[in-house]
């Protein structure tokens, strides 16, 4: 029985690792200016940041880069009722404002859909930013509202999938849970918690029955 549980767990970890390409960056929602910008450890690695904006708000992210580096960032919107026309602005700014690249979404709404199998979530695609870093330095990504809208978005940075050194037994469950909270899918959380309790109860019941038969 233990071997079966282990094999099932390994298959789940392998399949979810293949489906989930981004490493999540958690935060406390305090990155609201350049001084408190959320640090992106390595802009080449594929990261995802779940975030939200109020009307006329902005969120700030920062990273270090070298001249000639390729940089990628994009925004997607979770397919939630009320966000069909939501499209915040994406701005890349160099330290001391020596470099600035502003990208707005200019296609139709609600936008092209894509399904993310790990979190079982559908997103609407928005704008992408691809550029070459002009010189060594500190850079900022600013996601801001310019349309008097509020909503949720996922900011993706980098394109290299790298989970080396990560504990997948803790990383994947946390990432799944964060995704469900992000899209307000509390039903899936309750179901998963119920399944977890049921699985934990199986060995307990087996031990209880074994002791009972001995008596």
Show which residues each predicted segment covers.
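Sec/Tat signal peptide C-region and signal peptidase I cleavage site
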Residues: 16-21
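Low-complexity, Ser/Thr/Pro-rich intrinsically disordered linker/stalk segments at domain junctions
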Residues: 37-38, 44, 128-129
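Non-catalytic, beta-strand-enriched accessory regions in extracellular/secretory proteins
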Residues: 40-66, 70, 75-79, 89
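Extended, solvent-exposed segments with strong compositional bias
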Residues: 105-132
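A surface-exposed loop-and-adjacent beta-strand signature within N-terminal beta-sandwich domains
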Residues: 29-36, 50-51, 97-115
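Positively charged n-region of N-terminal signal peptides that target proteins for export
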Residues: 1-4
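Bacterial N-terminal signal peptides
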Residues: 7-15
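C-terminal edge strands of extracellular/lumenal beta-sandwich accessory domains
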Residues: 22-33, 61, 82, 87-99, ...
């Amino acid at each position: 029985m233990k071997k079966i549980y282990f094999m099932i767990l390994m298959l789940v970890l392998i399949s979810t690792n293949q489906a989930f390409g981004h490493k999540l960056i958690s935060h406390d929602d305090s990155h609201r200016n350049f001084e408190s910008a959320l640090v992106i450890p390595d802009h080449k690695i594929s990261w995802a940041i779940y975030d939200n904006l109020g009307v006329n708000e902005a969120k700030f992210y920062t990273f270090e880069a070298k001249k000639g580096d390729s940089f990628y960032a994009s925004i997607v919107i979770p397919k939630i009722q009320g966000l069909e026309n939501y499209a915040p602005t994406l701005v890349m700014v160099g330290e001391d404002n020596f470099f600035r690249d502003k990208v707005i979404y200019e296609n139709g709404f609600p936008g092209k859909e894509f399904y993310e199998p790990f979190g079982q979530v559908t997103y609407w695609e928005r704008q992408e930013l691809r550029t070459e870093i002009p010189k060594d330095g500190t850079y900022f990504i600013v996601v801001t509202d310019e349309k008097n809208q509020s909503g949720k978005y996922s900011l993706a940075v980098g394109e290299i999938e790298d989970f080396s050194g990560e504990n997948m037994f803790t990383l994947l469950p946390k990432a799944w849970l964060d995704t469900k909270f992000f899209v307000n899918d509390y039903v899936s959380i309750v179901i998963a918690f119920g399944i977890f309790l049921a699985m934990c109860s199986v060995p307990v019941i087996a031990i209880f029955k074994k002791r009972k038969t001995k008596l």
